[in-house]
Amino acid sequence: MVYITKRFDIAKDGSKYLMEDFASLVGKNEAEQGTFFKYDGCFEDIACAIKRFIPAWMIAMERFFKLVVFNYIYGNGDDHLKNFSIMRIGEHYQLAPAYDLMNTCLHIEGDDLGLNGGLSLTLEKSDVYERTGHPCRLDFERFGEYIGLKKKRIEMILDSFSLLPDEVEHLVNNSFLTEKMKRTYLRIVKERIQRFKRKSE
């Protein structure tokens, strides 16, 4: 299997946009944090860096929040600090397009979230999260509010992940995955959606 992605860091004239990943922006590196430095942190760290480095941070924050929820629902347990970046276009920085969006649970049993600190080290976890070890919708609602998003926008984003779109099922069933892996992929996503929808007391 080969992973191919279109370069988004090259301008039409062939020049490269300046890019910096969030491991660098939050000061994590192998020399100080060790081999697994890119997993050392929480998503709150990225949110704080977005506010610090991106002038139009509210727009970037909403995109970031969508990515965090997407990665959870679609089983990407490898969404670490180096898989989020900012890029400079003209005089301003913005959140780089999403990349490395894969269902890693097809191959590796790992954590629900790619960073070892989860969503936040300071936010209270829902009783569902505490009891099962898996976040539910309430945890993402709290996280969205904590990073500065409006409640109405949070609800709209979370509602969009409450059902498996027909297009996803169609794409998976028509992919080059084996029949067994197709079933596994869809099972993982459906299980995540059910977990996501659990009510917290």
Predicted regions and their residues:
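Anionic ligand-binding catalytic core segments
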Residues: 1-81, 85-201
